[in-house]
């Protein structure tokens, strides 16, 4: 007589609760170790993008100055005028003038407009900074007094990086970049590119050299040129 035999199913060998907790703990540790490095790599890449853009801005400002003879944007009558906002959407701002074509009707041909040979810059959009930040501006205004203390907000730069006091002549016309929405890590990455070796502590690095940083409002102020 034939007999039928059925093997019982083996129970699957899964993780125990203790083993699962151990695996999750290891994953959490790996994430904790890797995330800062990932963020640093991203910040480093973005900082390099902004550093490259800065060279373009410097060249544009220098060429504008060579033609027009001023760092201030020209007003409608062709007279240089300080403009503290630096928003590209403002037609009288420096970035708006740098991207203006010489054949544009905004070029009235009056006074120093006859020397204008723009565009000097292909694009500058306040709402889309290259690499770092949420918004950027390019003001053109007067510098603080020579030798006055540099702060995280004033129009002064310790370009030599030696004493925390402004090296710019009193009242000099200054073109600079203000970038909002920058983290401490992002500032450090850009500062390491632009101002490598300047400052022996965090406070000095934030206030000396071409790149200043105000951690209170996450803003960078980057010197471009002065006259």
Regions found by a protein language model. Name each.
Residues 1-15:
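N-terminal leader/signal peptides at the extreme start of proteins
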Residues 12-52:
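Amphipathic alpha-helical segments typified by the pilin-like N-terminal helix
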Residues 50, 54-61:
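N-terminal membrane-insertion helices
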Residues 60-68, 101, 119, 123-127, ...:
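Structured segments of extracytoplasmic/periplasmic soluble domains
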Residues 61-118:
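Short, glycine/small-hydrophobic-rich surface segments
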Residues 68-76, 128-139, 202-212:
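Surface-exposed patches in mature extracellular/periplasmic domains of secreted proteins
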Residues 114-163:
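Secreted/periplasmic proteins that engage bacterial cell-wall peptidoglycan
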Residues 149-227:
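Short, surface-exposed interaction loops/tails
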């Amino acid at each position: 007589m034939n007999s039928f035999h059925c093997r019982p199913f083996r129970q699957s060998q899964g993780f125990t609760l203790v083993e699962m907790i151990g695996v999750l703990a290891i994953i959490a540790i790996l994430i904790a170790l890797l995330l800062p490095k990932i963020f640093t790599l991203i910040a480093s890449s973005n900082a390099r993008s902004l550093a490259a853009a800065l060279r373009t801005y410097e060249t544009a400002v220098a060429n504008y100055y060579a033609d027009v003879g001023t760092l201030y944007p020209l007003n409608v009558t062709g007279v240089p005028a300080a403009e503290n906002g630096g928003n590209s959407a403002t037609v009288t701002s420096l970035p708006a003038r740098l991207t203006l074509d010489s054949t544009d009707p905004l070029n009235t041909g009056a006074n120093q407009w006859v020397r204008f040979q723009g565009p000097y810059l292909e694009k500058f959009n306040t709402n889309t900074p290259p690499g770092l930040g949420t918004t950027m501006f390019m003001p053109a205004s007067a510098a603080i007094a020579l030798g006055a203390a540099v702060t995280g907000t004033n129009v002064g730069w310790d370009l030599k990086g030696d004493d925390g006091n402004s090296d710019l002549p009193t009242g000099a016309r200054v073109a600079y970049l203000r970038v909002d929405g920058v983290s401490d890590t992002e500032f450090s990455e850009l500062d390491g590119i632009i101002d490598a070796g300047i400052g022996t502590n965090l406070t000095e690095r934030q206030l000396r050299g071409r790149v200043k940083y105000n951690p209170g409002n996450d803003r960078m102020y980057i010197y471009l040129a002065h006259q």
